[in-house]
Amino acid sequence: MRVVFQQCTKFSTSCNRAFLARFLKPVMNASPKEHVVKQLLKPVGLNVPPRPNIKYSEGNSWLDLFDGAKTEERIKELEIEFAKSGMYEMATFRKTNGKLFLSPESYWKADKALYFPHLSGRTLSSEDHGNVEDVLRGKTSVIRVFSTQVGDKISREYIKNTELGIDNYENQSCQVIDINFLENKLKSWLFKLSLNNLKSTVPVQRHDNYWLCHREQIPFLMRERLLINNVYSGYIFVVDPNLKIRFMACGPASADEFNKLWKVVGQLSKEKK
């Protein structure tokens, strides 16, 4: 009986070690690859349109732990997540100056374009929670997404170009939406304390379209698909009335990039008619 117990103990211990080693694999393999700046060719976005109360899932359920294929897939996902740490993001931002990719040559056609994700949050004008897609539906929208002051600054260059002397915040062809991503609970708490200060820095007429949304609503791998994972940069989406992403940009904007984006907005306005 003692021999049987010892054998079972050895088996249990070896299984635990194998199980643990399996899930430590992402940490061991977390060697980041150097970021390569490429021009966008394929549409960016999600396959399904946003809808209220949708919750994007991340990771495996308890039952999935016993599914070999799903577990291996999750391990690969974790390898990517561990590799792209905060230090990696900072180094990449410094190397690229926030220009993580180059905008497409032209906008994506409606039948090929993918959807903007569901996001909920509050605006500067109201404490009530709402869904961002509700204000996007039926309109052409230029959306700024940022989490930091530097991301806010460089993404604003696509709206206001001091070199050209143009301010498109009041452009009649579209609406401009600001989405300030709150990274975590600490930042959310700090924002509550400094909300009045933030309101004073944003023109009152912009408060209705300035959203505060928790970044964690969109899981890591979904942010990878949307190309918005680097917290230091700022991003621009052009979204059509059907909630599809038709154009995207990031990082600082040159005069040519500024003009390209607003040319796209003009073309989509004609398409709408």
UniProtKB/Swiss-Prot annotation:
Any one GO BP annotation for this protein: mitochondrial proton-transporting ATP synthase complex assembly
Entry GO MF terms: unfolded protein binding
GO cellular component: mitochondrial inner membrane
Family matches, as Pfam families: ATP-synt_10
Disulfide-bonded cysteines: none
Main location group: mitochondrion
UniProt keyword list: Membrane, Mitochondrion, Mitochondrion inner membrane
Compartments where located: Mitochondrion inner membrane
Record flagged with keyword Zinc: no
Family stated for the protein in its record: Belongs to the ATP10 family.
Functional summary from the UniProt entry: Involved in assembly of the mitochondrial F1-F0 complex.
Protein name listed in UniProt: Mitochondrial ATPase complex subunit ATP10
